[in-house]
Amino acid sequence: MKTHHLIRVVASLAMLATSGLAYAEEYKASTDEKAIKMTNVASLEARVQAKMEKGAFGYIRGGAEDENNLRSNTESFDKKYIMPRVLQGIELKEIDLSTQLLGIPLKTPIIQAPMAAQGLAHASGELATAKGMAQVGSIFSLSTYGNKTIEEVANVSGKNPFFFQLYMSKNNQFNEFILAQAVKHGAKAIILTVDSPVGGYREEDIKNNFQFPLGFANLEMFAR
């Protein structure tokens, strides 16, 4: 679901609201909360696939078209190596991963990129991710197409900073509304996405006949 669909989506959401229908009645995400034992990301992905609805997992895991870019990105990342620097006189106790981004102090140089529809994976959706990033002292980024509102994310983040990612819409009323919400609830930066003028041709979603079973919280707020 991308920018050019926004007006149609908002109209559909308004119709659903007046008819009393709810996305939550159609899709039941996991509510499990427990420590995860894992050996690597690949093994974790296999376990997740076994527990998730096929279409939802395909959306989260998949990429556009025949996934050439997805594979290229993974292969490129695999070529990044950690170079050991031994005998440099550095003590373990002296190692410090803290840094700053836009003047914001971080405990780690890794932040979380915006990801849509996290409610597909767990009922708490973006709220759980925001809490996790607060615990490790880094930044959570909320997608325009998240399943939780900016206000909800701000409430669980507490004093921990968060960013908001905006898909610029042709509907300027929506742009103004959502940016005002981000400012009101304390987002420290806006991540502007400009490389998605149309939705990706996602072959996995087509094969699975996947349709989003959950509402997009920020769009629903605008439609009210």
Predicted regions and their residues:
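Alpha/beta enzyme core
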Residues: 117, 131, 177-224
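Active-site-adjacent beta->alpha loops and helix N-cap segments on the catalytic face
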Residues: 123, 142-160, 169-177, 197-209
